[in-house]
Amino acid sequence: MKELVILTGHSGAGKSTAAGLLEDLGFFCIDNLPPEVVYQVASILSNNVDKLAIVLDIRSYLFGNIQNAIKDVKERYPFTKVLFLTAAKDTLIQRFAHTRRSHPLSKQTNSIGEAIELEFEIMKEIMEIADLVIDTTMLNPHQLRTKLTTFLEEKSEKTFVVHVISFGFKYGMPLDADFVFDARFFPNPFYINELRPKTGKDEEVKEFLRKIDGVSEYLNKIYELINIAISRYETEGRKEITVAIGCTGGKHRSVYFAEELGQMFLNKDYKVTIEHRDVELG
């Protein structure tokens, strides 16, 4: 089966890392193409290349109409997937300061902040039509690889995808979550010596939380609410939802809720991914 990915996004958001991961997954990667040759390059799929990734950065946008180029490619290759990487603006500024690299738009602006603002404005229409937008603000390369693999495994006739994330509030909320739920008002297993080193995936912690009044009801209410949202999302043509559940450190309560909620959606034959973002930190 032929696969074509157009990888784009904001400068500093991790396109080079993502391109390297795509190469590890067997993709032939070509980057920094002007719009007028994107369609021609895509045609190499007709030869001996089965998996092609075309990487476009802001410089490609400045050469012409990227949106039309992507439209032309999608008309010929309907299986084309557009992947857009972004990150919080403050994070992008920090990344450029750390690497001491100049922003591609730095000559057209007075500061790195202005360059990033301009880039967001130029790229906003492509971001809106992307098949998947990944916020890399809190992602490490392993987590990015997991998201890429999940994205590529989804078939055109795929069912709705439910992404469930557990996290610790003290490490910040996931910026790409559609819904965020708080589990901090339930008793914390952290304060029980024998449960402290364990996680919400361990049976002892599960048993402790199951016995707490309100836990089961809260879980069911979250499930009911997300089901309502999914039905509306599907009506609007959306194909995925990201649900985040947090506790203090992201090790016990949120992990338990994420695992239980993920299983509930698996039982409905949705495609489900479960990520425990901070379980090693909590």
From Swiss-Prot:
<dbReference type="InterPro" id="IPR053930">
    <property type="entry name" value="RapZ-like_N"/>
</dbReference>
<dbReference type="Pfam" id="PF22740">
    <property type="entry name" value="PapZ_C"/>
</dbReference>
<dbReference type="GO" id="GO:0005525">
    <property type="term" value="F:GTP binding"/>
</dbReference>
<comment type="similarity">
    <text>Belongs to the RapZ-like family.</text>
</comment>
<keyword id="KW-0342">GTP-binding</keyword>
<dbReference type="InterPro" id="IPR027417">
    <property type="entry name" value="P-loop_NTPase"/>
</dbReference>
<keyword id="KW-0067">ATP-binding</keyword>
<keyword id="KW-0547">Nucleotide-binding</keyword>
<dbReference type="Pfam" id="PF03668">
    <property type="entry name" value="RapZ-like_N"/>
</dbReference>
<dbReference type="GO" id="GO:0005524">
    <property type="term" value="F:ATP binding"/>
</dbReference>
<feature type="binding site">
    <location>
        <begin position="9"/>
        <end position="16"/>
    </location>
    <ligand>
        <name>ATP</name>
    </ligand>
</feature>
<protein>
    <recommendedName>
        <fullName>Nucleotide-binding protein Fnod_1159</fullName>
    </recommendedName>
</protein>
<comment type="function">
    <text>Displays ATPase and GTPase activities.</text>
</comment>
<feature type="binding site">
    <location>
        <begin position="57"/>
        <end position="60"/>
    </location>
    <ligand>
        <name>GTP</name>
    </ligand>
</feature>
<dbReference type="InterPro" id="IPR005337">
    <property type="entry name" value="RapZ-like"/>
</dbReference>
<dbReference type="InterPro" id="IPR053931">
    <property type="entry name" value="RapZ_C"/>
</dbReference>
